[in-house]
Amino acid sequence: MPKIVVVGAVAGGATCASQIRRLDKESDIIIFEKDRDMSFANCALPYVIGEVVEDRKYALAYTPEKFYDRKQITVKTYHEVIAINDERQTVTVLNRKTNEQFEESYDKLILSPGASANSLGFESDITFTLRNLEDTDAIDQFIKANQVDKVLVIGAGYVSLEVLENLYERGLHPTLIHRSDKINKLMDADMNQPILDELDKREIPYRLNEEIDAINGNEITFKSGKVEHYDMIIEGVGTHPNSKFIESSNIKLDRKGFIPVNDKFETNVPNIYAIGDIATSHYRHVDLPASVPLAWGAHRAASIVAEQIAGNDTIEFKGFLGNNIVKFFDYTFASVGVKPNELKQFDYKMVEVTQGAHANYYPGNSPLHLRVYYDTSNRQILRAAAVGKEGADKRIDVLSMAMMNQLTVDELTEFEVAYAPPYSHPKDLINMIGYKAK
Protein backbone atom coordinates (compact mmCIF):
# COMPACT_ATOMS: atom_id res chain seq x y z
CA MET A 1 0.00 0.00 0.00
CA PRO A 2 1.59 3.31 -1.09
CA LYS A 3 2.45 5.78 1.64
CA ILE A 4 1.91 9.48 0.98
CA VAL A 5 3.36 12.10 3.31
CA VAL A 6 2.12 15.69 3.10
CA VAL A 7 3.93 18.61 4.72
CA GLY A 8 1.43 21.33 5.65
CA ALA A 9 -2.29 21.05 6.38
CA VAL A 10 -3.82 24.28 5.15
CA ALA A 11 -5.08 25.23 1.65
CA GLY A 12 -2.66 23.21 -0.47
CA GLY A 13 -1.77 20.26 1.74
CA ALA A 14 -5.17 19.42 3.20
CA THR A 15 -6.90 19.89 -0.15
CA CYS A 16 -4.38 17.68 -1.94
CA ALA A 17 -4.67 14.91 0.65
CA SER A 18 -8.46 15.11 0.46
CA GLN A 19 -8.43 14.91 -3.35
CA ILE A 20 -6.05 11.94 -3.29
CA ARG A 21 -8.40 10.12 -0.93
CA ARG A 22 -11.34 10.85 -3.24
CA LEU A 23 -9.47 9.12 -6.07
CA ASP A 24 -7.59 6.51 -4.04
CA LYS A 25 -9.31 4.75 -1.15
CA GLU A 26 -6.34 2.54 -0.21
CA SER A 27 -3.16 4.61 0.17
CA ASP A 28 -1.86 5.48 3.62
CA ILE A 29 -1.92 9.29 3.86
CA ILE A 30 -0.38 11.27 6.71
CA ILE A 31 -0.10 15.05 7.06
CA PHE A 32 2.39 16.84 9.31
CA GLU A 33 1.45 20.38 10.34
CA LYS A 34 3.85 22.37 12.50
CA ASP A 35 1.22 24.71 13.93
CA ARG A 36 -1.90 24.28 16.06
CA ASP A 37 -4.62 24.36 13.41
CA MET A 38 -5.34 22.72 10.07
CA SER A 39 -7.70 23.66 7.25
CA PHE A 40 -8.34 27.22 8.31
CA ALA A 41 -9.31 29.99 5.89
CA ASN A 42 -6.32 32.35 5.66
CA CYS A 43 -8.36 34.88 3.73
CA ALA A 44 -10.93 35.07 6.53
CA LEU A 45 -8.48 36.12 9.24
CA PRO A 46 -8.75 39.94 8.87
CA TYR A 47 -12.54 39.58 8.92
CA VAL A 48 -12.38 37.49 12.09
CA ILE A 49 -10.38 40.31 13.70
CA GLY A 50 -12.97 42.82 12.48
CA GLU A 51 -15.81 40.63 13.79
CA VAL A 52 -17.34 40.59 10.30
CA VAL A 53 -17.01 36.82 10.63
CA GLU A 54 -18.98 36.56 13.85
CA ASP A 55 -17.39 33.39 15.18
CA ARG A 56 -13.86 32.12 14.52
CA LYS A 57 -15.26 28.58 14.16
CA TYR A 58 -16.46 29.57 10.68
CA ALA A 59 -12.83 30.05 9.62
CA LEU A 60 -11.87 26.52 10.70
CA ALA A 61 -13.10 23.85 8.30
CA TYR A 62 -11.69 20.76 10.01
CA THR A 63 -10.00 19.47 13.13
CA PRO A 64 -7.64 16.47 12.80
CA GLU A 65 -10.27 14.26 14.43
CA LYS A 66 -13.03 15.34 12.07
CA PHE A 67 -10.69 15.05 9.08
CA TYR A 68 -9.81 11.46 10.00
CA ASP A 69 -13.45 10.51 10.60
CA ARG A 70 -14.49 11.90 7.22
CA LYS A 71 -11.51 10.88 5.08
CA GLN A 72 -9.35 8.37 6.98
CA ILE A 73 -6.36 10.67 6.71
CA THR A 74 -4.08 11.13 9.72
CA VAL A 75 -3.16 14.72 10.59
CA LYS A 76 -0.51 15.39 13.22
CA THR A 77 -0.49 19.03 14.34
CA TYR A 78 2.46 20.52 16.24
CA HIS A 79 4.61 18.17 14.14
CA GLU A 80 7.27 19.96 12.10
CA VAL A 81 9.22 18.33 9.28
CA ILE A 82 12.77 19.57 9.85
CA ALA A 83 14.73 17.58 7.24
CA ILE A 84 14.29 15.49 4.09
CA ASN A 85 16.46 12.57 3.02
CA ASP A 86 15.35 12.14 -0.57
CA GLU A 87 17.79 9.28 -1.21
CA ARG A 88 16.26 7.11 1.52
CA GLN A 89 12.82 8.68 1.02
CA THR A 90 12.35 9.70 4.63
CA VAL A 91 11.51 12.89 6.50
CA THR A 92 12.67 13.84 9.98
CA VAL A 93 9.81 15.08 12.14
CA LEU A 94 9.96 17.13 15.35
CA ASN A 95 7.10 16.78 17.81
CA ARG A 96 6.96 20.37 19.03
CA LYS A 97 5.10 19.41 22.21
CA THR A 98 7.49 16.71 23.43
CA ASN A 99 10.63 17.81 21.53
CA GLU A 100 11.05 14.23 20.32
CA GLN A 101 12.26 13.48 16.79
CA PHE A 102 11.46 10.54 14.55
CA GLU A 103 11.74 9.48 10.91
CA GLU A 104 8.83 8.79 8.60
CA SER A 105 9.22 7.03 5.27
CA TYR A 106 7.28 7.93 2.14
CA ASP A 107 6.58 6.72 -1.38
CA LYS A 108 5.31 10.14 -2.43
CA LEU A 109 6.08 13.42 -0.66
CA ILE A 110 3.98 16.57 -1.13
CA LEU A 111 5.47 19.81 0.14
CA SER A 112 2.97 22.50 1.07
CA PRO A 113 4.58 24.23 4.07
CA GLY A 114 3.36 27.70 3.08
CA ALA A 115 5.07 30.91 4.08
CA SER A 116 5.79 32.86 7.24
CA ALA A 117 5.25 36.53 7.91
CA ASN A 118 8.30 38.77 7.81
CA SER A 119 9.07 40.81 10.90
CA LEU A 120 11.01 44.02 11.38
CA GLY A 121 12.77 42.39 14.32
CA PHE A 122 12.00 44.82 17.12
CA GLU A 123 11.68 43.34 20.61
CA SER A 124 8.19 44.37 21.62
CA ASP A 125 5.28 42.91 23.56
CA ILE A 126 2.76 44.92 21.55
CA THR A 127 3.87 43.83 18.06
CA PHE A 128 2.03 41.15 16.08
CA THR A 129 1.96 39.59 12.62
CA LEU A 130 -0.99 37.85 10.97
CA ARG A 131 -0.46 34.55 9.20
CA ASN A 132 -2.60 31.89 10.87
CA LEU A 133 -5.48 31.36 13.29
CA GLU A 134 -3.12 31.38 16.27
CA ASP A 135 -2.01 34.89 15.29
CA THR A 136 -5.65 35.90 14.90
CA ASP A 137 -6.53 34.64 18.36
CA ALA A 138 -3.50 36.38 19.88
CA ILE A 139 -4.46 39.71 18.27
CA ASP A 140 -8.10 39.40 19.31
CA GLN A 141 -7.24 38.44 22.89
CA PHE A 142 -4.70 41.26 23.20
CA ILE A 143 -7.25 43.81 21.98
CA LYS A 144 -9.81 42.62 24.53
CA ALA A 145 -7.40 42.21 27.46
CA ASN A 146 -5.69 45.58 27.01
CA GLN A 147 -8.59 47.76 25.89
CA VAL A 148 -6.66 48.57 22.73
CA ASP A 149 -7.61 51.79 20.96
CA LYS A 150 -4.69 53.09 18.85
CA VAL A 151 -3.14 50.57 16.45
CA LEU A 152 -0.18 51.13 14.13
CA VAL A 153 -0.45 49.11 10.90
CA ILE A 154 2.85 48.75 9.03
CA GLY A 155 2.76 48.03 5.30
CA ALA A 156 0.34 48.76 2.47
CA GLY A 157 -0.21 45.41 0.76
CA TYR A 158 -3.48 43.51 0.59
CA VAL A 159 -3.32 42.00 4.09
CA SER A 160 -2.39 45.28 5.77
CA LEU A 161 -5.22 47.10 3.99
CA GLU A 162 -7.75 44.44 5.00
CA VAL A 163 -6.51 44.45 8.59
CA LEU A 164 -6.67 48.25 8.80
CA GLU A 165 -10.22 48.34 7.46
CA ASN A 166 -11.36 45.68 9.91
CA LEU A 167 -9.71 47.35 12.89
CA TYR A 168 -11.50 50.58 11.95
CA GLU A 169 -14.84 48.82 11.54
CA ARG A 170 -14.31 47.23 14.96
CA GLY A 171 -14.18 50.71 16.43
CA LEU A 172 -10.42 51.06 16.91
CA HIS A 173 -8.25 53.92 15.67
CA PRO A 174 -5.62 52.63 13.20
CA THR A 175 -2.74 54.56 11.65
CA LEU A 176 -0.99 53.33 8.49
CA ILE A 177 2.69 53.76 7.67
CA HIS A 178 4.62 52.44 4.68
CA ARG A 179 8.32 52.64 3.96
CA SER A 180 7.88 54.00 0.41
CA ASP A 181 5.27 55.84 -1.62
CA LYS A 182 4.51 52.70 -3.65
CA ILE A 183 1.45 51.12 -2.06
CA ASN A 184 -0.52 48.06 -3.13
CA LYS A 185 2.10 46.98 -5.67
CA LEU A 186 -0.17 44.53 -7.48
CA MET A 187 -2.07 47.53 -8.85
CA ASP A 188 -0.94 50.26 -11.22
CA ALA A 189 0.44 53.04 -9.03
CA ASP A 190 -1.83 55.74 -10.45
CA MET A 191 -4.92 53.61 -9.82
CA ASN A 192 -4.31 53.46 -6.07
CA GLN A 193 -5.46 57.01 -5.27
CA PRO A 194 -8.86 55.81 -3.95
CA ILE A 195 -6.98 54.02 -1.14
CA LEU A 196 -5.69 57.35 0.13
CA ASP A 197 -9.06 58.99 -0.53
CA GLU A 198 -10.81 56.37 1.60
CA LEU A 199 -8.34 56.98 4.43
CA ASP A 200 -8.83 60.75 4.18
CA LYS A 201 -12.61 60.36 4.09
CA ARG A 202 -12.51 58.59 7.46
CA GLU A 203 -9.74 60.77 8.90
CA ILE A 204 -7.49 57.73 9.29
CA PRO A 205 -3.89 58.95 9.64
CA TYR A 206 -1.29 57.61 7.22
CA ARG A 207 2.30 58.44 6.34
CA LEU A 208 4.19 57.17 3.32
CA ASN A 209 8.01 57.06 3.22
CA GLU A 210 7.92 56.37 6.96
CA GLU A 211 9.57 53.67 9.07
CA ILE A 212 10.02 52.77 12.72
CA ASP A 213 13.35 53.63 14.28
CA ALA A 214 12.76 52.30 17.81
CA ILE A 215 10.08 50.83 20.06
CA ASN A 216 10.15 51.47 23.80
CA GLY A 217 7.04 50.02 25.40
CA ASN A 218 4.15 51.93 23.84
CA GLU A 219 6.40 54.74 22.62
CA ILE A 220 7.32 54.54 18.95
CA THR A 221 10.11 56.63 17.46
CA PHE A 222 9.97 57.02 13.68
CA LYS A 223 12.67 57.72 11.11
CA SER A 224 10.96 61.06 10.45
CA GLY A 225 11.67 62.07 14.04
CA LYS A 226 8.07 61.80 15.18
CA VAL A 227 7.39 60.13 18.54
CA GLU A 228 3.92 58.64 19.06
CA HIS A 229 2.22 56.22 21.43
CA TYR A 230 0.29 53.14 20.33
CA ASP A 231 -1.45 50.32 22.15
CA MET A 232 -0.62 47.78 19.46
CA ILE A 233 1.44 47.29 16.29
CA ILE A 234 0.53 44.92 13.45
CA GLU A 235 3.26 44.28 10.87
CA GLY A 236 2.33 43.47 7.28
CA VAL A 237 5.73 43.59 5.64
CA GLY A 238 5.60 40.59 3.33
CA THR A 239 6.28 36.89 3.68
CA HIS A 240 9.01 34.35 3.00
CA PRO A 241 8.66 30.67 2.01
CA ASN A 242 9.04 28.06 4.74
CA SER A 243 11.85 26.28 2.93
CA LYS A 244 14.71 26.19 5.44
CA PHE A 245 14.17 22.49 6.17
CA ILE A 246 14.44 21.69 2.45
CA GLU A 247 18.06 22.85 2.30
CA SER A 248 19.16 19.48 3.73
CA SER A 249 17.86 17.72 0.61
CA ASN A 250 18.69 17.67 -3.10
CA ILE A 251 15.57 19.66 -3.94
CA LYS A 252 16.41 22.74 -5.98
CA LEU A 253 15.53 26.12 -4.48
CA ASP A 254 15.72 29.46 -6.24
CA ARG A 255 17.55 32.42 -4.74
CA LYS A 256 14.46 33.52 -2.80
CA GLY A 257 13.83 30.09 -1.30
CA PHE A 258 10.99 29.01 -3.59
CA ILE A 259 10.86 25.60 -5.28
CA PRO A 260 10.71 25.67 -9.10
CA VAL A 261 8.28 23.01 -10.34
CA ASN A 262 7.28 21.63 -13.72
CA ASP A 263 3.74 21.51 -15.09
CA LYS A 264 2.98 18.47 -12.92
CA PHE A 265 4.21 20.32 -9.81
CA GLU A 266 7.10 17.88 -9.61
CA THR A 267 10.37 19.10 -8.14
CA ASN A 268 13.74 18.09 -9.57
CA VAL A 269 13.74 15.08 -7.20
CA PRO A 270 11.61 12.03 -8.11
CA ASN A 271 8.47 11.40 -6.04
CA ILE A 272 8.49 14.87 -4.48
CA TYR A 273 5.92 17.54 -5.37
CA ALA A 274 5.60 21.17 -4.23
CA ILE A 275 2.42 23.24 -4.16
CA GLY A 276 1.09 26.46 -2.68
CA ASP A 277 3.07 29.48 -1.55
CA ILE A 278 6.40 27.65 -1.76
CA ALA A 279 6.18 26.72 -5.46
CA THR A 280 7.03 28.89 -8.44
CA SER A 281 5.83 28.16 -11.96
CA HIS A 282 5.05 30.33 -15.03
CA TYR A 283 2.36 32.49 -16.54
CA ARG A 284 -0.24 30.94 -18.79
CA HIS A 285 -0.47 33.70 -21.38
CA VAL A 286 3.18 34.81 -21.70
CA ASP A 287 6.57 33.13 -21.43
CA LEU A 288 7.65 34.43 -18.01
CA PRO A 289 8.15 32.76 -14.62
CA ALA A 290 5.43 33.45 -12.07
CA SER A 291 4.98 33.08 -8.34
CA VAL A 292 1.37 33.62 -7.30
CA PRO A 293 0.91 32.79 -3.60
CA LEU A 294 -2.88 32.99 -3.60
CA ALA A 295 -5.67 30.55 -2.77
CA TRP A 296 -6.72 29.59 -6.30
CA GLY A 297 -3.23 28.42 -7.24
CA ALA A 298 -2.89 26.26 -4.13
CA HIS A 299 -6.22 24.55 -4.78
CA ARG A 300 -5.53 24.03 -8.49
CA ALA A 301 -2.09 22.58 -7.77
CA ALA A 302 -3.60 20.28 -5.14
CA SER A 303 -6.04 18.84 -7.67
CA ILE A 304 -3.37 18.33 -10.33
CA VAL A 305 -0.99 16.55 -7.94
CA ALA A 306 -3.81 14.36 -6.65
CA GLU A 307 -4.70 13.35 -10.22
CA GLN A 308 -1.04 12.63 -10.97
CA ILE A 309 -0.60 10.41 -7.93
CA ALA A 310 -3.87 8.61 -8.69
CA GLY A 311 -2.52 7.69 -12.13
CA ASN A 312 -3.68 10.45 -14.48
CA ASP A 313 -0.28 11.50 -15.79
CA THR A 314 -1.79 13.45 -18.70
CA ILE A 315 -3.10 16.31 -16.58
CA GLU A 316 -0.80 19.33 -16.44
CA PHE A 317 -0.84 22.87 -15.15
CA LYS A 318 -1.10 25.46 -17.91
CA GLY A 319 0.13 28.41 -15.89
CA PHE A 320 -0.98 31.32 -13.74
CA LEU A 321 -2.82 34.45 -14.76
CA GLY A 322 -2.31 36.07 -11.36
CA ASN A 323 -5.93 37.12 -10.90
CA ASN A 324 -6.26 39.08 -7.64
CA ILE A 325 -8.72 41.34 -5.86
CA VAL A 326 -9.10 43.27 -2.61
CA LYS A 327 -11.86 45.27 -0.97
CA PHE A 328 -10.86 48.47 0.82
CA PHE A 329 -13.83 50.19 2.39
CA ASP A 330 -16.13 51.26 -0.49
CA TYR A 331 -13.72 50.36 -3.32
CA THR A 332 -12.62 47.19 -5.06
CA PHE A 333 -9.14 46.89 -6.60
CA ALA A 334 -8.58 44.00 -9.03
CA SER A 335 -6.01 43.01 -11.61
CA VAL A 336 -4.95 40.05 -13.73
CA GLY A 337 -1.90 39.23 -15.82
CA VAL A 338 1.72 40.23 -15.52
CA LYS A 339 2.70 42.58 -12.71
CA PRO A 340 3.16 46.29 -13.48
CA ASN A 341 6.95 46.00 -13.20
CA GLU A 342 6.98 43.13 -15.72
CA LEU A 343 5.37 45.12 -18.53
CA LYS A 344 8.74 46.61 -19.46
CA GLN A 345 9.67 43.24 -20.98
CA PHE A 346 7.11 43.77 -23.74
CA ASP A 347 6.37 46.24 -26.51
CA TYR A 348 2.90 47.16 -25.32
CA LYS A 349 0.12 49.70 -25.57
CA MET A 350 -2.46 50.62 -22.97
CA VAL A 351 -6.12 51.49 -23.43
CA GLU A 352 -8.55 52.48 -20.69
CA VAL A 353 -12.10 53.62 -20.06
CA THR A 354 -13.83 55.20 -17.10
CA GLN A 355 -17.61 55.15 -17.05
CA GLY A 356 -20.50 54.04 -14.88
CA ALA A 357 -20.53 50.41 -13.86
CA HIS A 358 -24.11 50.16 -15.12
CA ALA A 359 -26.61 52.26 -17.09
CA ASN A 360 -26.31 55.92 -16.15
CA TYR A 361 -30.03 56.45 -15.64
CA TYR A 362 -30.32 53.56 -13.16
CA PRO A 363 -29.90 54.65 -9.51
CA GLY A 364 -26.72 53.99 -7.56
CA ASN A 365 -24.30 54.24 -10.45
CA SER A 366 -20.62 54.93 -9.77
CA PRO A 367 -17.53 55.20 -12.00
CA LEU A 368 -15.48 52.14 -12.85
CA HIS A 369 -11.94 52.60 -14.17
CA LEU A 370 -10.89 49.73 -16.45
CA ARG A 371 -7.46 49.47 -18.06
CA VAL A 372 -5.96 46.89 -20.44
CA TYR A 373 -2.38 46.45 -21.67
CA TYR A 374 -1.78 44.49 -24.86
CA ASP A 375 1.23 43.25 -26.81
CA THR A 376 1.66 45.25 -30.02
CA SER A 377 3.17 42.26 -31.83
CA ASN A 378 0.11 40.00 -31.55
CA ARG A 379 -2.45 42.26 -29.81
CA GLN A 380 -2.99 39.71 -27.06
CA ILE A 381 -3.80 40.98 -23.58
CA LEU A 382 -0.90 41.16 -21.14
CA ARG A 383 -2.57 42.73 -18.13
CA ALA A 384 -5.82 44.30 -16.99
CA ALA A 385 -6.76 46.31 -13.91
CA ALA A 386 -10.01 47.70 -12.54
CA VAL A 387 -10.95 50.04 -9.69
CA GLY A 388 -14.42 51.05 -8.62
CA LYS A 389 -17.21 50.70 -6.11
CA GLU A 390 -18.98 48.01 -8.12
CA GLY A 391 -18.39 45.81 -11.14
CA ALA A 392 -14.59 45.48 -10.94
CA ASP A 393 -14.72 41.78 -10.08
CA LYS A 394 -16.99 40.94 -12.99
CA ARG A 395 -14.85 42.72 -15.59
CA ILE A 396 -11.56 41.30 -14.35
CA ASP A 397 -12.92 37.75 -14.32
CA VAL A 398 -14.17 38.16 -17.90
CA LEU A 399 -10.76 39.49 -18.96
CA SER A 400 -9.08 36.61 -17.14
CA MET A 401 -11.07 34.19 -19.26
CA ALA A 402 -10.18 36.18 -22.38
CA MET A 403 -6.48 35.96 -21.50
CA MET A 404 -6.81 32.26 -20.70
CA ASN A 405 -8.01 31.74 -24.27
CA GLN A 406 -5.42 34.13 -25.76
CA LEU A 407 -7.98 36.49 -27.22
CA THR A 408 -6.77 39.71 -28.77
CA VAL A 409 -7.80 43.11 -27.49
CA ASP A 410 -9.81 43.57 -30.71
CA GLU A 411 -11.92 40.50 -29.96
CA LEU A 412 -13.22 42.20 -26.82
CA THR A 413 -15.69 43.99 -29.11
CA GLU A 414 -17.32 40.58 -29.65
CA PHE A 415 -17.92 39.93 -25.95
CA GLU A 416 -21.68 39.47 -25.53
CA VAL A 417 -22.62 41.17 -22.29
CA ALA A 418 -25.47 40.10 -20.00
CA TYR A 419 -27.19 43.47 -20.17
CA ALA A 420 -29.88 44.99 -18.01
CA PRO A 421 -29.75 48.55 -16.65
CA PRO A 422 -28.83 47.58 -13.05
CA TYR A 423 -25.79 45.59 -14.24
CA SER A 424 -24.06 46.93 -17.33
CA HIS A 425 -24.38 48.78 -20.66
CA PRO A 426 -25.43 47.57 -24.14
CA LYS A 427 -21.80 48.21 -25.01
CA ASP A 428 -20.00 47.20 -21.84
CA LEU A 429 -16.72 48.67 -20.63
CA ILE A 430 -15.01 45.55 -21.95
CA ASN A 431 -16.49 46.17 -25.41
CA MET A 432 -15.37 49.80 -25.24
CA ILE A 433 -11.79 48.73 -24.49
CA GLY A 434 -11.84 46.71 -27.72
CA TYR A 435 -13.29 49.57 -29.76
CA LYS A 436 -10.82 52.11 -28.37
CA ALA A 437 -7.89 49.80 -29.17
CA LYS A 438 -8.78 49.59 -32.88
Curated annotation (Swiss-Prot):
GO molecular function annotations of the record: CoA-disulfide reductase (NADPH) activity; flavin adenine dinucleotide binding; NADP binding; protein disulfide isomerase activity
Q: Which residues bind substrate?
A: 15, 19, 22, 39, 42, 71, 299, 427
Q: Where is the active site?
A: 43 (nucleophile), 43 (redox-active)
Asked whether the UniProt record includes NADP among its keywords, one would answer yes
Instruction: From the UniProt record, list the reaction(s) this protein catalyses.
Output: NADP(+) + 2 CoA = CoA-disulfide + NADPH + H(+)
Top-level class of the enzyme under EC nomenclature:
oxidoreductase
Q: Quick one: which residues bind NADP(+)?
A: 151-166
User: Which residues hold FAD?
Assistant: 8-33, 267-277, 419
Cofactors: FAD
In the record's cofactor note, how is the cofactor described as bound? Answer: Binds 1 FAD per subunit.
Keyword entries, A-Z: FAD, Flavoprotein, NADP, Oxidoreductase, Redox-active center
The family database entries (Pfam families) matched by this protein are listed as: Pyr_redox_2 (PF07992), Pyr_redox_dim (PF02852)
Q: What is its EC number?
A: 1.8.1.14
Q: Which domain of life is it from?
A: Bacteria
Its function?
Answer: Catalyzes specifically the NADPH-dependent reduction of coenzyme A disulfide.
The cross-references to PANTHER family, in alphabetical order and at most eight, read: NAD(P)H SULFUR OXIDOREDUCTASE (COA-DEPENDENT), PYRIDINE NUCLEOTIDE-DISULFIDE OXIDOREDUCTASE DOMAIN-CONTAINING
Other remarks in the entry: Reduction of disulfides occurs by a thiol-disulfide exchange reaction, but involves only a single catalytic cysteine residue that forms a stable mixed disulfide with CoA during catalysis.
* Record family assignment: Belongs to the class-III pyridine nucleotide-disulfide oxidoreductase family.
Complex and partners: Homodimer.
Record-given protein name: Coenzyme A disulfide reductase
Q: Which organism is it from?
A: Staphylococcus aureus (strain N315)
List the gene name.
cdr
